[in-house]
Amino acid sequence: NRPSFFQLRSTLSYNNRFIYEGGNPLLTPETNHDLQFTALYKWVQFGLNYQYRRNAIAFMTKEYEDNPDVVIFTTGNFKRMQYLTASAHLSPTVGIWKPELGIYFAQPFFKVTNQGSSKNMNRGSIYLFLQNSLQLPDEWILSLDADYQSEGNFGAMLQRSYWGIDAGIRKTFFNKRLTLGLQANDLWNSRYGSFMLFGPRLTYTKKANPDSR
């Protein structure tokens, strides 16, 4: 996989007096090796995947040459990065109720240098989602969905856990040619974008509350 033009950009943008963001014109392509297994039976599907990324392109930090007190958020090449993922997806139909349940587990195998020492970034994570659809008379459809992401490592980052619930109602008209709906996302405003980024000279923590509604 070749790096994108955005990743190769040579410009810098200013976040604050200690942090800049920019590209890396010295990036080289990465090579991916994937091994996948999928099994399907009626409304149940299982998957298993192993990925080996050689010369992997990933998010990182580095020192700003003109000022050692400033770090640059950028992308770089890492010798290798490995992932093992497993998934299960269930989608039965029970009368007017059509639920969908998804379970995903990701186990990374990766190391970074953080404040002078090697740090394992091997914390696995689980992602769950449950989607519920009720097919009511007169073409009314009610939906109630929930998802949960556990804490885990993604590259040089530790992603904090989050969860959320969405609800909606839809109705179709004119033999399903027109659909009108009302949707409410993230009812409890709980899908936070918090993470920790581990670099050679610093550990950066960000807690964000995006407008996911």
Can you describe what each PLM-predicted range is?
Residues 4-12, 18-21, 52, 56-65, ...:
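Outer-membrane beta-barrel translocator domains and adjoining extracellular loop/strand segments
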